[in-house]
Protein backbone atom coordinates (compact mmCIF):
# COMPACT_ATOMS: atom_id res chain seq x y z
CA UNK A 1 0.00 0.00 0.00
CA UNK A 2 1.52 3.32 -1.03
CA UNK A 3 2.16 5.91 1.63
CA UNK A 4 -0.26 8.80 1.63
CA UNK A 5 0.46 12.31 2.89
CA UNK A 6 -0.61 12.95 6.49
CA UNK A 7 -3.25 15.42 5.25
CA UNK A 8 -5.05 12.48 3.59
CA UNK A 9 -5.33 10.37 6.76
CA UNK A 10 -8.50 10.39 8.86
CA UNK A 11 -8.61 8.71 12.26
CA UNK A 12 -12.10 8.41 13.68
CA UNK A 13 -14.18 6.37 16.07
CA UNK A 14 -17.86 5.55 16.11
CA UNK A 15 -19.62 6.40 19.36
CA UNK A 16 -23.14 5.20 20.11
CA UNK A 17 -25.37 3.63 22.73
CA UNK A 18 -25.67 -0.19 22.78
CA UNK A 19 -27.66 -1.47 19.83
CA UNK A 20 -27.82 1.76 17.85
CA UNK A 21 -26.03 0.09 14.96
CA UNK A 22 -22.39 1.10 15.14
CA UNK A 23 -20.90 -2.33 14.42
CA UNK A 24 -23.28 -2.70 11.44
CA UNK A 25 -22.18 0.71 10.12
CA UNK A 26 -18.56 -0.41 10.51
CA UNK A 27 -19.42 -3.50 8.38
CA UNK A 28 -20.82 -1.29 5.62
CA UNK A 29 -17.81 1.03 5.64
CA UNK A 30 -15.48 -1.98 5.36
CA UNK A 31 -17.58 -3.42 2.53
CA UNK A 32 -17.85 -0.18 0.54
CA UNK A 33 -14.13 0.56 0.72
CA UNK A 34 -13.22 -3.03 -0.23
CA UNK A 35 -11.63 -3.97 3.12
CA UNK A 36 -13.25 -7.39 2.75
CA UNK A 37 -14.84 -8.78 -0.40
CA UNK A 38 -18.58 -9.45 -0.52
CA UNK A 39 -17.76 -13.16 -0.39
CA UNK A 40 -15.81 -12.75 2.86
CA UNK A 41 -18.60 -10.63 4.32
CA UNK A 42 -21.30 -13.12 3.31
CA UNK A 43 -23.12 -14.63 6.25
CA UNK A 44 -21.11 -12.54 8.70
CA UNK A 45 -22.46 -9.59 10.54
CA UNK A 46 -20.52 -7.39 12.94
CA UNK A 47 -17.16 -8.36 11.42
CA UNK A 48 -15.29 -6.47 14.12
CA UNK A 49 -17.06 -8.19 17.02
CA UNK A 50 -14.81 -11.22 17.07
CA UNK A 51 -15.96 -12.91 20.29
CA UNK A 52 -19.06 -15.15 20.06
CA UNK A 53 -20.46 -13.48 23.13
CA UNK A 54 -20.12 -10.08 21.43
CA UNK A 55 -22.16 -11.19 18.44
CA UNK A 56 -24.72 -13.04 20.50
CA UNK A 57 -25.47 -10.19 22.87
CA UNK A 58 -25.07 -7.67 20.06
CA UNK A 59 -22.55 -5.69 22.08
CA UNK A 60 -18.93 -4.70 21.46
CA UNK A 61 -16.60 -5.47 24.36
CA UNK A 62 -13.07 -5.02 23.04
CA UNK A 63 -12.29 -1.92 21.01
CA UNK A 64 -11.34 -3.00 17.47
CA UNK A 65 -9.49 -1.18 14.71
CA UNK A 66 -9.48 -1.37 10.91
CA UNK A 67 -7.68 0.53 8.13
CA UNK A 68 -9.60 1.37 4.96
CA UNK A 69 -8.46 2.86 1.65
CA UNK A 70 -10.94 5.24 -0.01
CA UNK A 71 -10.90 7.24 -3.23
CA UNK A 72 -13.02 10.33 -2.59
CA UNK A 73 -15.07 12.34 -5.09
CA UNK A 74 -12.20 14.85 -5.31
CA UNK A 75 -10.13 12.09 -6.94
CA UNK A 76 -7.62 11.79 -4.07
CA UNK A 77 -6.81 8.61 -2.16
CA UNK A 78 -7.46 8.66 1.57
CA UNK A 79 -6.62 6.31 4.43
CA UNK A 80 -9.27 5.87 7.11
CA UNK A 81 -8.45 4.34 10.48
CA UNK A 82 -11.70 3.31 12.11
CA UNK A 83 -11.88 2.50 15.82
CA UNK A 84 -15.01 0.57 16.78
CA UNK A 85 -15.65 1.24 20.46
CA UNK A 86 -17.89 -0.43 23.05
CA UNK A 87 -21.02 1.46 24.10
CA UNK A 88 -21.56 0.02 27.57
CA UNK A 89 -20.66 1.94 30.69
CA UNK A 90 -18.42 -0.85 32.09
CA UNK A 91 -16.15 -0.62 29.08
CA UNK A 92 -15.77 3.15 29.17
CA UNK A 93 -11.99 2.68 29.56
CA UNK A 94 -11.91 0.92 26.16
CA UNK A 95 -13.69 3.96 24.76
CA UNK A 96 -11.32 6.45 26.37
CA UNK A 97 -8.22 4.89 24.87
CA UNK A 98 -9.74 4.60 21.40
CA UNK A 99 -10.84 8.22 21.47
CA UNK A 100 -7.39 9.47 22.45
CA UNK A 101 -5.99 7.90 19.26
CA UNK A 102 -8.46 9.74 16.97
CA UNK A 103 -9.26 13.29 15.89
CA UNK A 104 -12.94 12.89 15.12
CA UNK A 105 -16.04 10.83 15.86
CA UNK A 106 -19.16 9.68 14.09
CA UNK A 107 -22.00 9.98 16.56
CA UNK A 108 -24.50 7.28 15.63
CA UNK A 109 -28.01 7.74 17.01
CA UNK A 110 -30.95 5.43 16.34
CA UNK A 111 -33.57 7.60 14.61
CA UNK A 112 -36.37 5.64 16.27
CA UNK A 113 -34.97 5.71 19.83
CA UNK A 114 -33.13 9.01 20.11
CA UNK A 115 -30.31 9.96 22.47
CA UNK A 116 -29.63 7.51 25.33
CA UNK A 117 -27.65 7.85 28.56
CA UNK A 118 -24.51 6.11 27.33
CA UNK A 119 -24.52 8.08 24.09
CA UNK A 120 -24.15 11.15 26.29
CA UNK A 121 -21.31 9.71 28.35
CA UNK A 122 -19.30 8.70 25.28
CA UNK A 123 -19.94 11.97 23.42
CA UNK A 124 -18.73 13.97 26.39
CA UNK A 125 -15.57 11.87 26.39
CA UNK A 126 -15.11 12.60 22.67
CA UNK A 127 -15.60 16.33 23.29
CA UNK A 128 -13.05 16.15 26.12
CA UNK A 129 -10.57 14.82 23.55
CA UNK A 130 -11.35 17.84 21.29
CA UNK A 131 -13.00 15.71 18.63
CA UNK A 132 -14.87 17.02 15.62
CA UNK A 133 -18.24 15.26 15.71
CA UNK A 134 -20.38 14.26 12.73
CA UNK A 135 -23.92 13.23 13.77
CA UNK A 136 -25.28 10.20 11.87
CA UNK A 137 -28.93 9.14 12.16
CA UNK A 138 -29.25 5.39 11.68
CA UNK A 139 -32.32 3.21 10.96
CA UNK A 140 -34.12 6.06 9.14
CA UNK A 141 -35.93 3.44 7.01
CA UNK A 142 -37.86 2.13 10.04
CA UNK A 143 -41.52 3.12 10.26
CA UNK A 144 -40.94 4.41 13.82
CA UNK A 145 -38.06 6.70 12.79
CA UNK A 146 -38.44 10.38 13.65
CA UNK A 147 -35.28 12.01 12.25
CA UNK A 148 -36.34 15.65 12.71
CA UNK A 149 -37.29 15.07 16.35
CA UNK A 150 -34.00 13.26 17.03
CA UNK A 151 -31.97 16.05 15.37
CA UNK A 152 -33.61 18.53 17.71
CA UNK A 153 -32.86 16.20 20.63
CA UNK A 154 -29.15 16.03 19.71
CA UNK A 155 -29.04 19.83 19.69
CA UNK A 156 -30.95 20.17 22.98
CA UNK A 157 -29.20 17.46 24.96
CA UNK A 158 -25.64 17.44 23.61
CA UNK A 159 -25.52 20.96 22.22
CA UNK A 160 -23.98 20.18 18.83
CA UNK A 161 -25.44 21.30 15.51
CA UNK A 162 -27.32 18.40 13.90
CA UNK A 163 -28.95 20.24 10.99
CA UNK A 164 -26.58 18.55 8.51
CA UNK A 165 -26.67 15.10 10.17
CA UNK A 166 -26.14 12.23 7.70
CA UNK A 167 -29.26 10.06 7.27
CA UNK A 168 -28.47 6.37 6.83
CA UNK A 169 -29.67 2.82 7.20
CA UNK A 170 -26.56 0.78 8.05
CA UNK A 171 -28.38 -2.50 7.43
CA UNK A 172 -29.37 -1.73 3.81
CA UNK A 173 -26.42 0.56 3.03
CA UNK A 174 -28.65 3.58 2.35
CA UNK A 175 -26.72 6.84 2.79
CA UNK A 176 -23.42 5.15 3.73
CA UNK A 177 -21.51 6.75 0.76
CA UNK A 178 -22.47 10.14 2.25
CA UNK A 179 -20.83 9.07 5.52
CA UNK A 180 -17.57 8.31 3.67
CA UNK A 181 -17.62 11.77 2.07
CA UNK A 182 -18.45 13.43 5.40
CA UNK A 183 -15.39 11.74 6.96
CA UNK A 184 -13.20 13.31 4.25
CA UNK A 185 -14.72 16.78 4.30
CA UNK A 186 -15.78 17.28 7.91
CA UNK A 187 -13.16 15.49 10.02
CA UNK A 188 -9.64 16.95 10.50
CA UNK A 189 -6.40 15.17 9.49
CA UNK A 190 -3.91 14.20 12.23
CA UNK A 191 -0.89 16.36 13.06
CA UNK A 192 2.62 14.94 13.36
CA UNK A 193 6.27 15.42 12.41
CA UNK A 194 7.91 12.65 10.40
CA UNK A 195 11.46 13.84 11.18
CA UNK A 196 11.01 14.07 14.96
CA UNK A 197 11.94 11.33 17.46
CA UNK A 198 9.53 8.41 17.56
CA UNK A 199 6.60 8.93 19.89
CA UNK A 200 3.62 6.53 19.79
CA UNK A 201 0.60 5.93 21.99
CA UNK A 202 -0.11 2.39 23.19
CA UNK A 203 -3.84 2.02 22.53
CA UNK A 204 -4.48 -1.64 23.32
CA UNK A 205 -2.75 -4.99 23.53
CA UNK A 206 -3.85 -8.60 23.40
CA UNK A 207 -2.30 -12.03 23.39
CA UNK A 208 -1.89 -14.04 20.22
CA UNK A 209 -0.89 -17.70 20.49
CA UNK A 210 1.61 -17.44 17.62
CA UNK A 211 2.90 -13.88 17.87
CA UNK A 212 2.93 -13.30 21.62
CA UNK A 213 1.58 -9.92 22.66
CA UNK A 214 0.25 -7.79 19.80
CA UNK A 215 0.35 -4.07 20.58
CA UNK A 216 -2.02 -1.62 18.91
CA UNK A 217 -0.37 1.80 18.51
CA UNK A 218 -1.03 5.28 17.15
CA UNK A 219 2.15 6.95 15.87
CA UNK A 220 2.20 10.62 16.91
CA UNK A 221 5.68 11.72 15.73
CA UNK A 222 8.51 9.98 13.91
CA UNK A 223 8.37 6.58 12.20
CA UNK A 224 7.86 3.10 13.69
CA UNK A 225 10.19 0.80 11.72
CA UNK A 226 10.54 -2.95 11.63
CA UNK A 227 13.78 -3.99 13.36
CA UNK A 228 14.11 -0.82 15.47
CA UNK A 229 14.57 -0.95 19.24
CA UNK A 230 11.83 0.75 21.22
CA UNK A 231 11.23 1.55 24.87
CA UNK A 232 8.02 1.65 26.89
CA UNK A 233 8.31 4.81 28.97
CA UNK A 234 5.92 3.63 31.69
CA UNK A 235 7.81 0.43 32.52
CA UNK A 236 11.24 1.32 31.11
CA UNK A 237 11.44 -2.03 29.27
CA UNK A 238 13.05 -2.12 25.80
CA UNK A 239 12.11 -4.44 22.92
CA UNK A 240 13.14 -5.16 19.32
CA UNK A 241 10.25 -4.63 16.92
CA UNK A 242 9.70 -7.84 14.92
CA UNK A 243 6.61 -7.00 12.88
CA UNK A 244 4.84 -3.79 11.92
CA UNK A 245 1.46 -3.68 10.20
CA UNK A 246 -2.22 -2.81 10.25
CA UNK A 247 -5.63 -4.48 10.03
CA UNK A 248 -7.87 -4.35 6.99
CA UNK A 249 -9.51 -6.24 9.14
CA UNK A 250 -7.00 -8.94 8.05
CA UNK A 251 -3.51 -8.58 9.51
CA UNK A 252 -1.29 -6.92 6.87
CA UNK A 253 2.45 -6.42 7.43
CA UNK A 254 4.42 -3.36 6.26
CA UNK A 255 7.93 -2.02 6.88
CA UNK A 256 6.97 1.15 8.71
CA UNK A 257 4.14 3.27 10.11
CA UNK A 258 4.39 7.06 9.79
CA UNK A 259 2.92 9.87 11.93
CA UNK A 260 -0.87 9.84 12.23
CA UNK A 261 -1.11 6.15 11.34
CA UNK A 262 -2.68 3.46 13.51
CA UNK A 263 -1.39 -0.10 13.34
CA UNK A 264 0.20 -2.90 15.35
CA UNK A 265 3.65 -4.08 16.35
CA UNK A 266 4.90 -7.35 17.86
CA UNK A 267 8.16 -7.48 19.79
CA UNK A 268 8.48 -10.78 21.68
CA UNK A 269 6.63 -9.32 24.66
CA UNK A 270 5.68 -12.13 27.02
CA UNK A 271 2.66 -10.77 28.91
CA UNK A 272 -0.10 -8.28 28.30
CA UNK A 273 0.55 -6.96 31.82
CA UNK A 274 3.94 -5.66 30.54
CA UNK A 275 2.16 -3.32 28.14
CA UNK A 276 0.29 -0.58 29.92
CA UNK A 277 -2.53 0.99 28.01
CA UNK A 278 -1.91 4.71 27.51
CA UNK A 279 1.87 4.27 27.76
CA UNK A 280 4.21 6.14 25.41
CA UNK A 281 6.49 4.12 23.11
CA UNK A 282 9.70 5.85 22.00
CA UNK A 283 13.10 5.15 20.43
CA UNK A 284 15.38 3.36 22.90
CA UNK A 285 18.54 5.12 21.66
CA UNK A 286 17.22 8.70 21.82
CA UNK A 287 14.02 8.67 23.88
CA UNK A 288 11.68 11.65 24.15
CA UNK A 289 11.50 13.30 27.55
CA UNK A 290 7.75 13.98 27.80
CA UNK A 291 5.16 11.23 27.89
CA UNK A 292 1.89 11.62 26.02
CA UNK A 293 -1.06 12.47 28.25
CA UNK A 294 -2.10 8.87 28.96
CA UNK A 295 -5.16 7.22 30.37
CA UNK A 296 -6.06 6.46 33.92
CA UNK A 297 -5.52 2.74 34.51
CA UNK A 298 -8.79 0.83 34.77
CA UNK A 299 -9.47 0.20 38.46
CA UNK A 300 -11.80 -2.64 39.50
CA UNK A 301 -14.94 -1.32 41.16
CA UNK A 302 -17.03 -4.42 41.87
CA UNK A 303 -15.71 -7.53 43.61
CA UNK A 304 -17.16 -10.98 44.02
CA UNK A 305 -16.03 -14.50 44.83
CA UNK A 306 -16.11 -17.14 42.07
CA UNK A 307 -16.06 -20.77 43.21
CA UNK A 308 -16.18 -23.95 41.13
CA UNK A 309 -19.23 -26.13 41.87
CA UNK A 310 -16.98 -29.17 41.51
CA UNK A 311 -13.87 -28.80 43.70
CA UNK A 312 -11.81 -30.74 41.12
CA UNK A 313 -12.21 -27.84 38.68
CA UNK A 314 -10.15 -25.47 40.83
CA UNK A 315 -6.94 -25.76 38.79
CA UNK A 316 -8.88 -25.46 35.52
CA UNK A 317 -10.48 -22.28 36.87
CA UNK A 318 -7.08 -20.86 37.85
CA UNK A 319 -5.70 -21.53 34.35
CA UNK A 320 -8.84 -20.13 32.68
CA UNK A 321 -8.66 -16.90 34.68
CA UNK A 322 -4.99 -16.54 33.81
CA UNK A 323 -5.89 -16.82 30.12
CA UNK A 324 -8.68 -14.22 30.34
CA UNK A 325 -6.35 -11.94 32.27
CA UNK A 326 -3.91 -12.07 29.32
CA UNK A 327 -6.37 -10.08 27.23
CA UNK A 328 -8.16 -8.12 29.89
CA UNK A 329 -5.83 -6.18 32.12
CA UNK A 330 -8.75 -4.65 34.04
CA UNK A 331 -9.81 -8.02 35.46
CA UNK A 332 -8.00 -8.98 38.68
CA UNK A 333 -8.20 -12.07 40.89
CA UNK A 334 -6.65 -13.57 44.01
CA UNK A 335 -7.21 -16.88 45.75
CA UNK A 336 -9.67 -17.16 48.65
CA UNK A 337 -11.17 -19.98 50.67
CA UNK A 338 -14.65 -20.29 52.06
CA UNK A 339 -15.82 -22.79 54.66
CA UNK A 340 -19.06 -23.23 52.73
CA UNK A 341 -17.81 -23.21 49.14
CA UNK A 342 -14.22 -24.45 49.37
CA UNK A 343 -11.41 -22.97 47.27
CA UNK A 344 -12.09 -20.17 44.80
CA UNK A 345 -11.05 -16.68 43.75
CA UNK A 346 -11.90 -13.14 44.77
CA UNK A 347 -12.23 -11.24 41.50
CA UNK A 348 -12.34 -7.54 40.66
CA UNK A 349 -14.40 -6.15 37.76
CA UNK A 350 -15.19 -2.79 36.18
CA UNK A 351 -18.92 -3.22 36.68
CA UNK A 352 -21.75 -5.72 36.60
CA UNK A 353 -21.78 -6.34 32.85
CA UNK A 354 -18.04 -7.00 33.01
CA UNK A 355 -18.65 -9.51 35.83
CA UNK A 356 -21.42 -11.22 33.86
CA UNK A 357 -19.31 -11.44 30.71
CA UNK A 358 -16.27 -12.87 32.49
CA UNK A 359 -18.51 -15.43 34.20
CA UNK A 360 -20.15 -16.35 30.92
CA UNK A 361 -16.81 -16.64 29.14
CA UNK A 362 -15.49 -18.92 31.89
CA UNK A 363 -18.48 -21.23 31.64
CA UNK A 364 -18.66 -21.13 27.84
CA UNK A 365 -15.04 -21.21 26.72
CA UNK A 366 -13.70 -23.40 29.54
CA UNK A 367 -16.83 -25.41 30.34
CA UNK A 368 -16.80 -24.48 34.03
CA UNK A 369 -19.76 -24.54 36.39
CA UNK A 370 -19.40 -21.65 38.86
CA UNK A 371 -21.07 -20.03 41.85
CA UNK A 372 -20.68 -16.27 42.32
CA UNK A 373 -21.02 -14.75 45.80
CA UNK A 374 -22.76 -11.43 46.43
CA UNK A 375 -21.00 -8.59 44.61
CA UNK A 376 -19.42 -6.00 46.90
CA UNK A 377 -17.50 -2.75 46.47
CA UNK A 378 -14.36 -1.30 48.07
CA UNK A 379 -15.04 0.21 51.49
CA UNK A 380 -12.60 2.48 53.28
CA UNK A 381 -12.37 2.02 57.04
CA UNK A 382 -10.78 4.26 59.63
CA UNK A 383 -9.82 2.38 62.79
CA UNK A 384 -9.67 3.78 66.31
CA UNK A 385 -5.85 3.47 66.34
CA UNK A 386 -5.64 5.77 63.29
CA UNK A 387 -4.90 3.15 60.61
CA UNK A 388 -6.88 3.13 57.37
CA UNK A 389 -7.97 0.01 55.52
CA UNK A 390 -9.53 -0.78 52.16
CA UNK A 391 -11.82 -3.79 52.27
CA UNK A 392 -13.47 -5.56 49.36
CA UNK A 393 -14.54 -8.73 51.11
CA UNK A 394 -16.99 -8.43 54.06
CA UNK A 395 -15.31 -11.47 55.69
CA UNK A 396 -12.13 -9.40 56.25
CA UNK A 397 -13.94 -6.66 58.15
CA UNK A 398 -12.33 -5.99 61.55
CA UNK A 399 -14.22 -6.09 64.84
CA UNK A 400 -16.90 -3.37 65.15
CA UNK A 401 -15.31 -2.04 68.35
CA UNK A 402 -12.12 -1.14 66.44
CA UNK A 403 -13.87 0.78 63.66
CA UNK A 404 -14.23 4.54 63.96
CA UNK A 405 -15.75 5.23 60.53
CA UNK A 406 -16.75 3.34 57.39
CA UNK A 407 -16.86 5.13 54.03
CA UNK A 408 -18.53 3.78 50.92
CA UNK A 409 -18.17 4.81 47.25
CA UNK A 410 -20.88 6.99 45.68
CA UNK A 411 -21.71 7.45 42.03
CA UNK A 412 -23.46 10.05 39.94
CA UNK A 413 -26.05 8.28 37.81
CA UNK A 414 -27.67 9.76 34.71
CA UNK A 415 -30.98 8.12 33.85
CA UNK A 416 -33.01 8.86 30.72
CA UNK A 417 -36.58 7.59 30.89
CA UNK A 418 -39.90 8.15 29.12
CA UNK A 419 -42.06 10.55 31.08
CA UNK A 420 -44.71 7.99 32.12
CA UNK A 421 -42.18 5.86 34.05
CA UNK A 422 -40.53 8.79 35.85
CA UNK A 423 -42.46 8.20 39.12
CA UNK A 424 -41.37 4.55 39.39
CA UNK A 425 -37.76 5.42 38.51
CA UNK A 426 -37.60 8.16 41.16
CA UNK A 427 -39.11 5.80 43.74
CA UNK A 428 -36.50 3.15 42.90
CA UNK A 429 -33.68 5.68 43.35
CA UNK A 430 -35.15 6.92 46.66
CA UNK A 431 -35.45 3.34 47.92
CA UNK A 432 -31.76 2.87 47.15
CA UNK A 433 -30.78 5.80 49.40
CA UNK A 434 -30.34 8.14 46.43
CA UNK A 435 -30.25 11.95 46.47
CA UNK A 436 -31.75 13.70 43.46
CA UNK A 437 -29.48 16.33 41.87
CA UNK A 438 -31.38 17.55 38.84
CA UNK A 439 -34.32 16.75 36.60
CA UNK A 440 -34.66 18.10 33.06
CA UNK A 441 -36.98 17.29 30.19
CA UNK A 442 -35.81 16.44 26.69
CA UNK A 443 -38.93 16.28 24.56
CA UNK A 444 -41.12 13.54 26.04
CA UNK A 445 -38.27 12.08 28.09
CA UNK A 446 -36.92 13.01 31.47
CA UNK A 447 -33.22 13.13 32.29
CA UNK A 448 -32.56 12.59 36.00
CA UNK A 449 -29.24 12.92 37.77
CA UNK A 450 -28.95 11.09 41.08
CA UNK A 451 -26.23 10.55 43.65
CA UNK A 452 -26.40 6.89 44.70
CA UNK A 453 -24.25 4.60 46.86
CA UNK A 454 -22.52 2.07 44.59
CA UNK A 455 -23.33 -0.66 47.12
CA UNK A 456 -27.04 -0.26 46.26
CA UNK A 457 -26.40 -0.33 42.52
CA UNK A 458 -24.24 -3.46 42.24
CA UNK A 459 -26.93 -5.85 43.45
CA UNK A 460 -29.75 -5.63 40.95
CA UNK A 461 -30.35 -1.94 40.31
CA UNK A 462 -30.02 -2.29 36.55
CA UNK A 463 -32.52 -5.17 36.37
CA UNK A 464 -34.97 -3.30 38.58
CA UNK A 465 -34.62 -0.14 36.51
CA UNK A 466 -35.38 -2.08 33.35
CA UNK A 467 -38.44 -3.71 34.93
CA UNK A 468 -39.96 -0.51 36.39
CA UNK A 469 -39.52 1.29 33.05
CA UNK A 470 -40.60 -1.68 30.85
CA UNK A 471 -37.07 -1.69 29.41
CA UNK A 472 -37.15 1.91 28.16
CA UNK A 473 -34.89 3.66 30.69
CA UNK A 474 -31.17 3.86 30.01
CA UNK A 475 -28.55 4.31 32.69
CA UNK A 476 -24.97 5.49 32.92
CA UNK A 477 -22.77 6.28 35.91
CA UNK A 478 -19.35 7.42 37.04
CA UNK A 479 -17.72 7.24 40.46
CA UNK A 480 -17.62 10.49 42.40
CA UNK A 481 -16.20 10.08 45.91
CA UNK A 482 -16.37 8.26 49.25
CA UNK A 483 -18.84 9.31 51.95
CA UNK A 484 -19.24 8.11 55.56
CA UNK A 485 -22.04 5.57 55.96
CA UNK A 486 -23.84 3.70 58.72
CA UNK A 487 -23.02 0.21 57.47
CA UNK A 488 -23.21 -3.04 59.40
CA UNK A 489 -21.90 -6.50 58.66
CA UNK A 490 -24.76 -8.95 58.38
CA UNK A 491 -24.06 -12.66 58.72
CA UNK A 492 -26.28 -15.60 57.91
CA UNK A 493 -25.99 -18.47 60.38
CA UNK A 494 -27.19 -21.95 59.53
CA UNK A 495 -27.41 -24.23 62.56
CA UNK A 496 -25.43 -21.60 64.53
CA UNK A 497 -22.54 -21.74 62.02
CA UNK A 498 -21.85 -18.53 60.03
CA UNK A 499 -21.89 -19.06 56.24
CA UNK A 500 -19.04 -16.81 55.11
CA UNK A 501 -20.14 -16.73 51.46
CA UNK A 502 -23.39 -15.01 52.46
CA UNK A 503 -22.01 -12.33 54.78
CA UNK A 504 -22.37 -8.79 53.45
CA UNK A 505 -22.16 -5.14 54.39
CA UNK A 506 -25.56 -3.45 54.32
CA UNK A 507 -26.94 -0.12 55.45
CA UNK A 508 -28.41 -0.33 58.95
CA UNK A 509 -31.86 0.78 57.76
CA UNK A 510 -32.02 -2.01 55.19
CA UNK A 511 -30.42 -4.81 57.21
CA UNK A 512 -33.62 -6.19 58.72
CA UNK A 513 -35.53 -6.31 55.43
CA UNK A 514 -32.71 -7.98 53.56
CA UNK A 515 -31.95 -10.37 56.43
CA UNK A 516 -35.58 -11.49 56.66
CA UNK A 517 -35.85 -11.99 52.89
CA UNK A 518 -32.66 -14.07 52.85
CA UNK A 519 -33.59 -16.39 55.72
CA UNK A 520 -37.07 -16.96 54.26
CA UNK A 521 -35.53 -17.87 50.91
CA UNK A 522 -33.03 -20.22 52.55
CA UNK A 523 -35.80 -21.92 54.53
CA UNK A 524 -37.60 -22.80 51.30
CA UNK A 525 -34.50 -24.30 49.73
CA UNK A 526 -32.66 -26.15 52.51
CA UNK A 527 -34.13 -29.67 52.63
CA UNK A 528 -35.29 -31.02 56.04
CA UNK A 529 -32.66 -33.03 57.94
CA UNK A 530 -33.12 -35.45 60.84
CA UNK A 531 -32.78 -32.51 63.25
CA UNK A 532 -34.25 -29.01 63.18
CA UNK A 533 -32.13 -26.28 61.57
CA UNK A 534 -32.35 -22.66 62.71
CA UNK A 535 -31.45 -20.12 59.99
CA UNK A 536 -30.59 -16.72 61.44
CA UNK A 537 -29.54 -13.31 60.15
CA UNK A 538 -27.36 -11.56 62.71
CA UNK A 539 -25.51 -8.28 63.17
CA UNK A 540 -22.70 -8.89 65.64
CA UNK A 541 -24.34 -10.89 68.44
CA UNK A 542 -27.86 -9.64 67.75
CA UNK A 543 -30.20 -11.87 65.73
CA UNK A 544 -32.47 -9.76 63.50
CA UNK A 545 -34.40 -12.50 61.68
CA UNK A 546 -34.91 -16.23 62.13
CA UNK A 547 -36.63 -19.13 60.38
CA UNK A 548 -36.52 -22.82 61.29
CA UNK A 549 -36.43 -25.84 59.00
CA UNK A 550 -38.49 -28.49 60.81
CA UNK A 551 -36.90 -31.88 61.51
CA UNK A 552 -37.95 -35.09 59.82
CA UNK A 553 -39.24 -37.39 62.54
CA UNK A 554 -40.25 -40.98 62.88
CA UNK A 555 -43.44 -41.74 64.79
CA UNK A 556 -41.82 -43.54 67.74
CA UNK A 557 -45.13 -44.03 69.58
CA UNK A 558 -46.75 -45.96 66.71
CA UNK A 559 -46.26 -49.34 68.39
CA UNK A 560 -47.75 -48.28 71.75
CA UNK A 561 -51.42 -49.20 72.01
CA UNK A 562 -53.36 -47.65 74.88
CA UNK A 563 -51.69 -48.24 78.21
CA UNK A 564 -49.69 -45.81 80.25
CA UNK A 565 -48.86 -42.30 78.96
CA UNK A 566 -45.47 -42.43 80.70
CA UNK A 567 -44.32 -45.11 78.23
CA UNK A 568 -45.05 -42.77 75.28
CA UNK A 569 -43.46 -39.86 77.06
CA UNK A 570 -40.30 -41.87 77.69
CA UNK A 571 -39.98 -42.72 73.97
CA UNK A 572 -40.58 -39.10 72.92
CA UNK A 573 -37.99 -37.84 75.43
CA UNK A 574 -35.50 -40.37 74.14
CA UNK A 575 -36.13 -39.20 70.56
CA UNK A 576 -35.74 -35.57 71.64
CA UNK A 577 -32.37 -36.36 73.26
CA UNK A 578 -31.21 -38.08 70.08
CA UNK A 579 -32.23 -35.10 67.92
CA UNK A 580 -30.41 -32.75 70.29
CA UNK A 581 -27.23 -34.80 70.02
CA UNK A 582 -27.61 -34.98 66.25
CA UNK A 583 -27.98 -31.24 66.04
CA UNK A 584 -24.73 -30.82 67.95
CA UNK A 585 -22.75 -33.06 65.62
CA UNK A 586 -24.86 -33.03 62.48
CA UNK A 587 -23.69 -31.22 59.35
CA UNK A 588 -26.14 -29.25 57.23
CA UNK A 589 -25.87 -29.63 53.47
CA UNK A 590 -26.74 -26.34 51.83
CA UNK A 591 -27.68 -26.89 48.18
CA UNK A 592 -26.11 -24.65 45.50
CA UNK A 593 -29.46 -23.17 44.49
CA UNK A 594 -30.01 -21.94 48.06
CA UNK A 595 -26.85 -19.81 47.75
CA UNK A 596 -27.81 -18.43 44.38
CA UNK A 597 -31.39 -17.65 45.44
CA UNK A 598 -30.29 -16.04 48.72
CA UNK A 599 -27.93 -13.72 46.86
CA UNK A 600 -30.66 -12.67 44.45
CA UNK A 601 -33.31 -11.68 46.99
CA UNK A 602 -34.70 -8.19 46.89
CA UNK A 603 -35.32 -6.55 50.23
UniProtKB/Swiss-Prot annotation:
Enzyme class name: hydrolase
CDD domains (UniProt xref): EF4_II (cd03699), EF4_III (cd16260), LepA (cd01890), lepA_C (cd03709)
Transmembrane regions listed in the UniProt entry: none
UniProt main location, coarse: membrane
One cellular component term from this protein's GO annotations in UniProt: plasma membrane
GO terms, biological process: positive regulation of translation
Membrane-related topology note: Peripheral membrane protein
EC number: 3.6.5.n1
Ranges of residues in domain tr-type G: 7-191
Catalysed reactions, as listed in the record: GTP + H2O = GDP + phosphate + H(+)
The entry's keywords: Cell inner membrane, Cell membrane, GTP-binding, Hydrolase, Membrane, Nucleotide-binding, Protein biosynthesis
Subcellular localization, as worded in the UniProt entry: Cell inner membrane
Gene Ontology MF annotations: GTP binding; GTPase activity; guanosine tetraphosphate binding; ribosome binding; translation elongation factor activity
Superkingdom assignment: Bacteria
InterPro entries listed in its UniProt record: EF-4 (IPR006297), EFG_III/V (IPR035647), EFG_V-like (IPR000640), EFTu-like_2 (IPR004161), G_TR_CS (IPR031157), LepA_C_sf (IPR038363), LepA_CTD (IPR013842), LepA_IV (IPR035654)
Residues binding GTP, per UniProt: 19-24, 138-141
NCBIfam families per the UniProt record, alphabetical: lepA, small_GTP
Function: Required for accurate and efficient protein synthesis under certain stress conditions. May act as a fidelity factor of the translation reaction, by catalyzing a one-codon backward translocation of tRNAs on improperly translocated ribosomes. Back-translocation proceeds from a post-translocation (POST) complex to a pre-translocation (PRE) complex, thus giving elongation factor G a second chance to translocate the tRNAs correctly. Binds to ribosomes in a GTP-dependent manner.
Family: Belongs to the TRAFAC class translation factor GTPase superfamily. Classic translation factor GTPase family. LepA subfamily.
Protein name: Elongation factor 4
Organism in which the protein naturally occurs: Bradyrhizobium diazoefficiens (strain JCM 10833 / BCRC 13528 / IAM 13628 / NBRC 14792 / USDA 110)
Gene name tied to this protein: lepA
Amino acid sequence: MTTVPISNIRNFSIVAHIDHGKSTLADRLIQMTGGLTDREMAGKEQVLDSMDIERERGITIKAQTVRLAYRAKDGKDYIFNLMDTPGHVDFAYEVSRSLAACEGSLLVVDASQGVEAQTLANVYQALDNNHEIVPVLNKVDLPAAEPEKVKQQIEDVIGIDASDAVMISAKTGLGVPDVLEAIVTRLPPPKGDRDATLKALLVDSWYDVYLGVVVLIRVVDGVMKKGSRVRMMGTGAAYDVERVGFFTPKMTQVDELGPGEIGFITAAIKEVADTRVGDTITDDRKPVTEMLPGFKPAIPVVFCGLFPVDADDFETLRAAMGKLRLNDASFSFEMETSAALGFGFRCGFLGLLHLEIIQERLSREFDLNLIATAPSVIYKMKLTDGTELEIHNPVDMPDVVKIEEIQEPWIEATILTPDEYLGSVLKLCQDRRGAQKELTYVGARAMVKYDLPLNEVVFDFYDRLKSVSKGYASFDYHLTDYKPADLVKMQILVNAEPVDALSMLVHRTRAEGRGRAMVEKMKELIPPHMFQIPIQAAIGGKVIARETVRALRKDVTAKCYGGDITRKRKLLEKQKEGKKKMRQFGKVDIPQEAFIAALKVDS
